[in-house]
Amino acid sequence: MTRMQQRTLMVMAGGTGGHVFPGLAVAHLMQAWGWRVVWLGNPNGMEATLVPKHGIPMEYVQFGGLRGKGMKTKLMLPVNLLRACMQSLSVLRRVKPDVVLGMGGYITFPAGMMTALSGTPLVLHEQNSIAGLANKVLAKLAKRVLVAFPKALPHAEWTGNPIREELARTTAPRQRYAARSGPLNVLVVGGSLGASALNEVVPRALAKLAPHERPRIVHQAGAKHIDALRANYEAAGIAAGDGAQLVPFIDDMTSAYANADLVICRSGAMTVAEIAAVGVAAFFVPFPYAVDDHQTTNAAFLADNGAALLVQQRDLSADALADWLRSQTRASLAEMAERSRSLAKPDATEQVAQICATVAGVTPSLSPEGKQQ
């Protein structure tokens, strides 16, 4: 694609990694196809720091949500929404995108509305199993509506969640599990913010298992929670390093997933997508305060198909977890992992990118020069 022919994709996403990282996956592929990519986000969101590190220029719109905000913010909503709409229109006129991809976040609503009203094609992607109000409204204006989970929005196309390419290239579960012996390998993921329920219950559950029954543990807790996690393991009589690796962060999550027989974690949309892509058994404990309880329905997509276990936080106990771990074998977990892999959408990134290109009236370039290296 020559410079004169170069098309422009504008990605609008922000607020959380669940919106930003899928957008980045699509953005990088479109760049590899020769597209110019511009990102629209909030100057106060994580995207303002993260996206420029990926070599993608930023445009900004100031707009936020109302949850947990005071009366003054709520009264100012009409003014703030109008301002965000005008800012969005200004960006659209300046960037002149051929297609806009909405990946979620508060700024998606005013920017998506102005995209549709200006006549620019809008492609909408919903990452969670339950769509928010903004996407329910924008879905009526978008040229194509894509979802990560079936039935999240009516008349939408099920593409799955765009993920990092290396996750989909992981060796098949059957081969990975068959090559292992000895204690089970369990990965506990609390995320960057940690998950206090997991940090408290998992060590106590392990303490209830006889030494020969205990799995090898890698437990990630977040920097702010790592000291408390170490104290929890010590209180349970399990020394760090004695079959338990306690870490604040994991840089290579692909390898961490691939080396695990079981992952104990929350069930954010990207976590569920990544676990399915790799193909690993999961024990999901949904975050109980997620909007619309979407983490429960995210987890249910795998759990209802025998690919994971879903336990609500209120029902999580050391005794119950210990009993369940005692009942599992590597073979039983391998079966769950294979079911999980069968539900994955490994081509989601390419499918979303192709839809964006098609909506813009372009046949995606899949020549050697256009492919990602």
UniProtKB/Swiss-Prot annotation:
It is a peripheral membrane protein. GO terms for molecular function: UDP-N-acetyl-D-glucosamine:N-acetylmuramoyl-L-alanyl-D-glutamyl-meso-2,6-diaminopimelyl-D-alanyl-D-alanine-diphosphoundecaprenol 4-beta-N-acetylglucosaminlytransferase activity; undecaprenyldiphospho-muramoylpentapeptide beta-N-acetylglucosaminyltransferase activity. Its main location: membrane. Its EC number is 2.4.1.227. CDD domains: GT28_MurG. It catalyses: di-trans,octa-cis-undecaprenyl diphospho-N-acetyl-alpha-D-muramoyl-L-alanyl-D-glutamyl-meso-2,6-diaminopimeloyl-D-alanyl-D-alanine + UDP-N-acetyl-alpha-D-glucosamine = di-trans,octa-cis-undecaprenyl diphospho-[N-acetyl-alpha-D-glucosaminyl-(1->4)]-N-acetyl-alpha-D-muramoyl-L-alanyl-D-glutamyl-meso-2,6-diaminopimeloyl-D-alanyl-D-alanine + UDP + H(+). InterPro entries: GlcNAc_MurG, Glyco_trans_28_C, GlycoTrans_28_N. One of its GO terms (biological process) is cell wall organization. It is found in: Cell inner membrane. GO terms for cellular component: plasma membrane. It is an enzyme of class 2 (transferase). Signal peptide: none annotated. Pathway: Cell wall biogenesis; peptidoglycan biosynthesis. UDP-N-acetyl-alpha-D-glucosamine binds at residues 16-18, 128, 164, 192, 250, 295. Keywords: Cell cycle, Cell division, Cell inner membrane, Cell membrane, Cell shape, Cell wall biogenesis/degradation, Glycosyltransferase, Membrane, Peptidoglycan synthesis, Transferase. Belongs to the glycosyltransferase 28 family. MurG subfamily. Cell wall formation. Catalyzes the transfer of a GlcNAc subunit on undecaprenyl-pyrophosphoryl-MurNAc-pentapeptide (lipid intermediate I) to form undecaprenyl-pyrophosphoryl-MurNAc-(pentapeptide)GlcNAc (lipid intermediate II). NCBIfam families: murG. This is UDP-N-acetylglucosamine--N-acetylmuramyl-(pentapeptide) pyrophosphoryl-undecaprenol N-acetylglucosamine transferase. It comes from Paraburkholderia phymatum (strain DSM 17167 / CIP 108236 / LMG 21445 / STM815). The gene is murG.
